[in-house]
Amino acid sequence: MAERKASVERDTLETQIKASINLDGTGKARFDIGVPFLEHMLDQIARHGLIDLDIESKGDLHIDDHHTVEDVGITLGQAFSKAIGDKKGIRRYGHAYVPLDEALSRVVIDFSGRPGLQMHVPFTRATVGGFDVDLFQEFFQGFVNHANVTLHIDTLRGTNTHHQIETVFKAFGRALRMAVELDERMAGQMPSTKGVL
């Protein structure tokens, strides 16, 4: 089996980002981004997706977190697209429900080749530890656009914003794990009746 790894660099006037992933990893993660709450959430993707992630970023954090959060999503999406290759043999679809105390979120993903995001998370607060939670929409939009996936994110219950976000990222990691997993019965086959994704 070919290694499903990728390294991507994104260099703009706003951010400089390096991301490396291993889709067949063990959940190892290393981050140097400068946005602690984002790093905490990315760790959920790695651990629950069993995907090795290594991301470094230097950005205009003196302005705010927006460009860094969005560009990390873009770069991670590019890395996924590169690592997954032609998509032959993958399960393609993934889904997960994850609870955390009172919060419950559902994430469904399709490596369809068609970018689309439906995100319905009624945050109960605007910030967590100084982090603007609206930026997670920018993160996921960047990921979707560059991984070329359809992604549905719904928080079904929850009153604690930290719990809402954490359940989203844990479910996202688990859905990714399911979708990128190789299916022995589909070896070498495209998971689409069109023959292409």
Swiss-Prot record:
Cellular component terms per the entry's GO annotation: cytoplasm
Keywords for the protein's UniProt record, in alphabetical order: Amino-acid biosynthesis, Cytoplasm, Histidine biosynthesis, Lyase
Full protein name: Imidazoleglycerol-phosphate dehydratase
GO annotation terms (biological process): L-histidine biosynthetic process
UniProt source species: Pseudomonas fluorescens (strain ATCC BAA-477 / NRRL B-23932 / Pf-5)
Pathway involvement of the protein, from the record: Amino-acid biosynthesis; L-histidine biosynthesis; L-histidine from 5-phospho-alpha-D-ribose 1-diphosphate: step 6/9
Enzyme class: lyase
EC number: 4.2.1.19
Subcellular localization, as worded in the UniProt entry: Cytoplasm
GO MF terms, alphabetically ordered: imidazoleglycerol-phosphate dehydratase activity
Stretches assigned to coiled coil: none
Catalytic activity line of the entry: D-erythro-1-(imidazol-4-yl)glycerol 3-phosphate = 3-(imidazol-4-yl)-2-oxopropyl phosphate + H2O
TM annotation in the entry: none
Tagged with keyword Cytoplasm: yes
InterPro entries: IGPD_sf (IPR038494), ImidazoleglycerolP_deHydtase (IPR000807), ImidazoleglycerP_deHydtase_CS (IPR020565), Ribosomal_Su5_D2-typ_SF (IPR020568)
Family: Belongs to the imidazoleglycerol-phosphate dehydratase family.
